[in-house]
Amino acid sequence: MKRTFLSLMLTCWLASLLAAGNATARPPEARAATLSLVYTLSFSQPHTHLYEVAFTIGNVNAPQIDLVMPTWTPGSYLQREFARNVQEFAALDESSRPLRWEKANKATWRVETGSANGRARTVYVRYLVYANELSVRTSHLDASHAYFNGASVFMFVKGATDQPVKLKINAPAGWRITTPLALAPGSDGFYTAPNYDVLVDSPTEVGTHRLLEFDHRGKRHRIAIWGEGNFDEARLKEDFAKIVEQGALMFGGLPYDHYTFIVHVQQGIGGGLEHLNSTTLQTRPDAFSPRKHYLGFLLLTSHEYFHLWNVKRIRPKSLGPFDYENENYTRALWLSEGTSDYYGRLLLRRAGLMTSAEYLENMVAEIARYEQTPGRKVMSAESASFNAWIKGYRPDENSPNSAIDYYNKGDLLGWMLDFEIRSRTGGKKSLDDVMRYLDENYAQRGVGFPEEELKGVFEKVAGADFTDFFRRYVSGTDEID
């Protein structure tokens, strides 16, 4: 691409944007009856970094059950082997007698329940989780706070991830609990989730953190901040509300009762992870000033908030319900992640939180990054998405030559597709309409889109053929010119 041409084209159309499997044995099934699934999480000695997990499994009528620790967390496409942090596993019956168990594979504990002839039993499981890795993908516990990403803490009963669960959090005196989970009415502090997916998609911050709150469009929004930084509380609430409003304008409302932003402010950390009705953001203490730093933080916030729709609801069919034991492959992360980068920037501009000059500067930087990556000539956006499990989170010295970043390429594809749709429809349609179509026809029905139908969605919205575009730029490696 030529810089002068790109700058001119970006400037010309910017105004229009603002308008708008078990390896050893076949596991036993736990499906014969609806189980009672209750977790209790304690941390009586937080300085040890050890979470104490009690898992009560009632109405068990199978002679064996498999308890599985996830090997990865949704939104972060790498096998993280959370079972490595589990210690002191034990299983007991109703009389506190030990039950026999064995490891069936690296992440599965097989328990002999003692149930015979279909007689229902209750199994009590206890284990510890070591949590001293501060990232958005893991859990962290020390004397100052507790943060948990559920996939790294809670085992599940194989075959029962679709059943309701409850969670009790025993927090130290003086520590508040901020979580997207809802309290069960009259339950004496038990939180509830309709299934395991929602439980582990609800990151939780416990401690003496700041808690900022604002209402927007009748919905409560909370910002839990752990750590000290150069932020202005009133400005944060105001700017977050502007981002929320742009999402609501684009999709015609907010698909939640309440939303939680968890913000960790510490030296040496950064990044974000999307969740169903929340996000975790990590940043440095100086991320809120000067303006260049603050724009970076707002871009992160906007990107993760846009995931509320794009990937948490508008998702490839393969990304939910999740298989927590194996890789979940998709060729569409360029859309789920890269296009969220594109809209993260665009929502800030539409909200007035980024100037036209800042928008163009950021966009040109993405173009330069892409053009300086030789791997663009050998790896497609689809291939980068599919190989995220072995490439995306494991860069080495040869990565720039052999691979591309699906965030970066997907960001540019979002821009190109938006431009193509606007051009082919005389400005009557845009990428916004594609996202709304995916939301209305898939997300709101609670299903993922088949990836083979994605091109057809663009064609339906634009009334034009996108075969050549997808062949060259999505599944192919043609140079963008």
Q: Where on the chain are the PLM-derived regions?
A:
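Acidic/His/Gly-enriched intrinsically disordered linker/tail segments
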Residues: 314-322, 327-408, 424, 442-445
